Amino acid sequence: MKTLDYYILDVFTDHKFKGNQLSVVYTDEDLEQQQYYDIAREFGYSETSFVSYSPTDNAFKVRSFTPANFEIIGAGHNLLGAVCLALLKKWDIFKGQNGETWVLMADGKIPLSIIGKNGLPYVGMKQRPAEIIGTVPAQIIADAVGLTTDDLSLNGWEINIVKTEVGHLMVPVKNLESLKKAILNKSLLKEASAKFGFEGCYLFTTEHTKTDYLAETRFFNPSIGIDEDPATGTAAGPLAGYLEKLGFIQKGADYRILQGEFVNQPSIIQVKVADDGIWISGSSVIVMKGELYL
């Protein structure tokens, strides 16, 4: 019988029992594909990350899976939590990188920035520049999230599919009241996702009462088994790129996005648009540790 250590973290927060929950399993070698699926399903969180250090690549490697047997390739809470864990445990994950800081995910190099904040590592992850790759009629999305087309009117902005690592749907919502009353219709959103070629649906409003935040958001992605996610870095990056293209935010400036309020797991995602990509940043805290028996 093989024993693996695992950790549970709360991600995009500096408080336990807030943020987005993540299970991280330390492996010293690749597992069988079915084992990744089984372990992710056993934990039951939106994502489980599997981490190891590769001397061949001089890199910390991360793979992430959902309970519905999907592998996640984007730099979101799945990667942030894994890197924060390594830093909190003081694992030497950057040896051999000649002063650079990066990790491997799906065989792609993800550049990182690391500072300390409130006694915790504060990690930035670089995504690709945002690209608008499509649009979806408002009525289709309104039906899928239990709102009206009037609820989806904000500054005349379009509903666009925006991609950095992953193509998510950016859905402007009129105000906080409309955002709060959204109700997911899984089957309709799955149909729209398949027809128009987007992954998740990111509802956001800039019309809210919390002045410290750029936007308040909700994320639905039933196609990969996520009903509502408390924090979604792979969607926050595209949102920052979308708003910068509209001239609503500036390049080089830091902004904060609030997500997870309506599932009682408030999360804070910092975003910054640069010339060569988009930075997503945040903290994580370890909540528990255990052993997994294979």
Protein language model features and the residues they cover:
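Active-site proximal loop and beta-alpha junction motif in alpha/beta enzyme cores
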Residues: 1-75, 80-294
